[in-house]
């Protein structure tokens, strides 16, 4: 039997993957590490991480407000965590590179976690009269997709499906519906709540929750964050400015720019 001269090439370049991982900004790295840590903690059988940190409407009270921040970091099983990490990393990395590390911390520990949770609790508990617990970083995935969809809509209002032109801002809604249909045990309401907040973020309505750049620069200078923290993204290192977006193409006839369907990307579940 003949011995092959060489192994078949890998479907990805390990060197490029390693280079990409080494360039990840600070907050993105910390989020990935916390998700991994919670998954490892869930492997033990003494204490249930999911029961402790999930977003469970009937469990929210004065002493359990931490759930509004812990649920995006917790996952049910390796596959749930792994796929969400793959989908979240490029989106979160881009956000931090565009807006800075301190802004990313302020938003994701604050309104970008608590606002989707608030909508979910309001509808799930007081309208649907249910108590379904949800966990998973897909809340941030759909939120960032919603924000990106709004920014894309401003420069490329439509994508073409045959002869039909569909607004690009609807793409996260299609993704949400498809995930709910084809991926079991997902929370359509949780994903939809995240998309709504993502739309508000993309439209600029959440600017009020972002600390002024003057204050951010003072904190960075006072603590020397850029010099002390590796991979820290300062206010002055931001890629596109706070809420700006660079146009990717010249204007088409009639002001409409088609966007390929590949914009939909990869999305995964929110919930056990």
From Swiss-Prot:
What is the E.C. number?
3.4.21.105
* Superkingdom to which the source organism belongs: Eukaryota
Question: Where, by residue number, does the polypeptide cross the bilayer?
Answer: 30-50, 72-92, 103-123, 133-153, 164-184, 186-206
What keywords is this UniProt entry annotated with? Answer: Hydrolase, Membrane, Protease, Serine protease, Transmembrane, Transmembrane helix
The protein's topology relative to the membrane is: Multi-pass membrane protein
One example of the protein's molecular function in GO is:
serine-type endopeptidase activity
What is the top EC class of this enzyme, as a single word? hydrolase
The annotated phenotype of a deletion mutant is: Impairs growth under hypoxic conditions and leads to increased azole drug susceptibility, reduced siderophore production, and full loss of virulence in a murine model of invasive pulmonary aspergillosis (IPA).
Name the Pfam families for this protein.
Answer: Rhomboid
Catalytic activity from the UniProt record = Cleaves type-1 transmembrane domains using a catalytic dyad composed of serine and histidine that are contributed by different transmembrane domains
Q: Name one GO cellular component term.
A: membrane
Which residues are named in the active-site annotation?
Answer: 138, 191
Database matches in InterPro entries: Peptidase_S54_rhomboid_dom (IPR022764), Rhomboid-like_sf (IPR035952)
Q: Where in the cell is it found?
A: Membrane
Q: Which GO terms describe its biological process?
A: proteolysis
Similarity section = Belongs to the peptidase S54 family.
Q: What does this protein do?
A: Rhomboid protease that catalyzes intramembrane proteolysis. Required for transcription factor srbA activation by mediating its release from the membrane and thereby regulating its activity under hypoxic conditions. Essential for iron homeostasis and resistance to azoles such as voriconazole. Required for virulence in murine models of invasive pulmonary aspergillosis (IPA).
Q: What is this protein called?
A: Rhomboid-type serine protease B
């Amino acid at each position: 039997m003949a011995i092959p001269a060489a192994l078949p090439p890998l479907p990805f370049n390990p060197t490029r993957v390693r280079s990409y991982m080494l360039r990840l900004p600070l907050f993105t790295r910390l989020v990935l590490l916390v998700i991994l840590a919670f998954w490892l903690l869930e492997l033990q059988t003494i204490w249930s991480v999911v029961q402790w940190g999930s977003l469970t409407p009937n469990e929210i009270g004065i002493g359990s407000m931490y759930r509004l921040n812990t649920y995006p970091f917790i996952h049910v099983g390796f596959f749930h965590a792994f796929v969400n990490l793959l989908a979240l990393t490029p989106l979160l990395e881009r956000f931090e590179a565009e807006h800075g590390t301190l802004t990313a911390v302020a938003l994701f520990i604050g309104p970008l976690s608590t606002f989707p949770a608030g909508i979910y609790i309001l509808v799930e508990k007081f309208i649907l009269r249910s108590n379904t617990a949800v966990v998973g970083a897909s809340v941030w995935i759909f939120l960032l997709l919603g924000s990106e969809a709004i920014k894309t809509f401003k420069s490329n209002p439509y994508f073409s499906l045959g002869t039909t032109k569909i607004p690009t801002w609807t793409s996260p809604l299609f993704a949400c519906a498809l995930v709910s249909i084809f991926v079991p045990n997902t929370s359509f309401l949780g994903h939809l709540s995240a998309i709504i907040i993502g739309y508000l973020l993309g439209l600029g309505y959440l600017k009020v929750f972002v600390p002024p750049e003057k204050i951010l620069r003072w904190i960075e200078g006072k603590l020397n964050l850029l010099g002390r923290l590796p991979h820290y993204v300062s206010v002055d290192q931001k890629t596109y400015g706070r809420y700006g977006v660079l146009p990717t193409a010249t204007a088409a006839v009639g002001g409409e720019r088609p966007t390929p369907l590949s914009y939909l990307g990869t999305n995964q579940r929110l919930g056990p």
